[in-house]
């Protein structure tokens, strides 16, 4: 039973770490088109908002 519990924690930790890596990669990147934001479909190049004149990658 301990081995199953440890395996479950490792799987959960790995999936959480992977999601965090994708989130950090997608934010705060300047871009000109969607291909600059990487291969993820959820990470897109967004137009500027407010006082910022630059395009940036974000997940929405």
From Swiss-Prot:
Q: Which organism is it from?
A: Ixodes scapularis (Black-legged tick)
Extract the coiled-coil ranges from the record: none
Q: How is it modified after translation?
A: Contains 3 disulfide bonds.
Gene Ontology terms, MF aspect: toxin activity
Which UniProt keywords are given for this protein, alphabetically ordered?
Disulfide bond, Hemostasis impairing toxin, Platelet aggregation inhibiting toxin, Secreted, Signal, Toxin
Q: What does this protein do?
A: Tick salivary platelet aggregation inhibitor that plays an important part in the anti-hemostatic strategy of ticks. Inhibits platelet aggregation induced by ADP, thrombin and thromboxane A2 (TXA2). Blocks platelet adhesion to soluble collagen (most probably through the binding to alpha-2/beta-1 integrin (ITGA2/ITGB1)) and binds to purified glycoprotein IIb/IIIa (ITGA2B/ITGB3) in a dose-dependent manner. In vivo, reduces thrombus weight effectively in a rat arteriovenous shunt model and inhibits thrombosis in a carrageenan-induced mouse tail thrombosis model.
- Listed GO CC annotations: extracellular region
**Designated name of the protein:** Ixodegrin-like peptide
Main subcellular location of this protein, as a coarse class: secreted
Q: In which tissues is it expressed?
A: Expressed in salivary glands.
Family per record: Belongs to the ixodegrin family.
Q: Where in the cell is the protein located?
A: Secreted
Q: Point out the signal peptide segment.
A: 1-19
Question: Lineage from the top down?
Answer: Eukaryota, Metazoa, Ecdysozoa, Arthropoda, Chelicerata
Motif placement: Cell attachment site: 49-51
